[in-house]
Amino acid sequence: VIKVAVLPQGSVSDEAVRHLLRGLEYELVYYKLITDVCLSTANGDTDYCVVPIENTIEGSVSAHLDFMIHDMDLPIQAEWVFPPTQNLIGFPDTDLAAVEKVLSHQVAIAQCREYLKANLSHAEKEVVSSTVEGVKQVQREGNPNWVAVGTQLAADIHGLTVLAKDIGDHENNMTRFLLVGPKELNGKRSEHLKTSILITLPEDYPGALHQVLSAFAWRRINLSRIESRPTRKQLGNYYFYIDIEDSMDSVLLRGALKEIEAIGCELRVLGSYPSFNYSEV
């Protein structure tokens, strides 16, 4: 049985990892904060951790990416996408016109901006640590004038009612998750393989980023993402996080990475792993 660290029971992460691990024997260990989720695996208390890393609407979850870069030294073992369905949750007798406060995670609030503007513009929006925490606070308070944005699973667990289903602004909203841990995930295979790397450019080397991209371009290696993040060492110093549509088994990719190191770049491979779409899992 594999032990997997994840954000609280009823969160989108909880729904997403259940989807990925269908058919496998696993135990979920819940933590309130993403830092604790990651550290449990880094410390050996769990085999894997689940990290939400990107969303169709909001883009990169930079804080999670930074934590993986600076505070963990474990490889990515899989990625998958999952559609987060956000709902308005409260008590059966809640009157939307009387709602005073909406509680949820900042990403969930952002994903439902248009609905909240049209239906609850009068209510205060309070950001909490997770969608589940918002649901818990509404349940604890017992006030019908408080509502939360969260999953059906969270509403069921905490005995609340879904007042409005699927209130997200975009139908094609997807969240990308990473499974991070020391060992390869057995029992799941995908034809689609990816590699993630971190590059630090050499100082005083004009055109270094162009050289890096050229190493991939002339080999016809596709990059699906490139993002700069601060190194935290000096103002203006950045890492480049790059997702590559290829496996480390590829001779072409290994050649590209050697070329990049030859121009003086520091290189760290964050993982070479299977990538699953929603229907493939």
Give the predicted meaning of each segment.
Residues 1-281:
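Domain-level signature for soluble enzymes in the chorismate/prephenate branch of the shikimate pathway
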